[in-house]
């Protein structure tokens, strides 16, 4: 469940497979990440392979914004009524929303997966790209971080939308919570050679992680 929750807060999505008029609503879960995160895709696949019929597939596509040919990896689960129930909580009118009861399901592991999906590291702060959520939903996320993890976040403008930032002091708290749950290939999300805290957090392991990632 942590993989589903963390991914749905991030880049993952549920695709509704039936409207539920004469039968239960069904949905399937789709994972799609770029080539740099190939290992992360396969890690998610291993966590969910009892729901999946095919291994992750490679796809090549043209990115008009960057005028480049991109490579990415994806897989999806089989459709099920159980995922249809989760769809009901995470979607409204076909759009992803922040469930009212998200505080019951967020924990350090699902938070780490959310960060692996949407987190970034500037060397002096962390941000979570929460652009898909409304401003009111992001205010609820700020409250969630404060009440459940004791972390103070800030909503910052990012062009026409908003995201959540964690400045000096707070990002250290966040790193301590999520680092035990990060997979090795995603440690670059918190390890930065310009950031002395990385070495304190990961000790002698930090140089190895930087080489591996």
What do these predicted regions represent?
Residues 1-213:
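Internal intein/HINT superfamily modules and their associated LAGLIDADG
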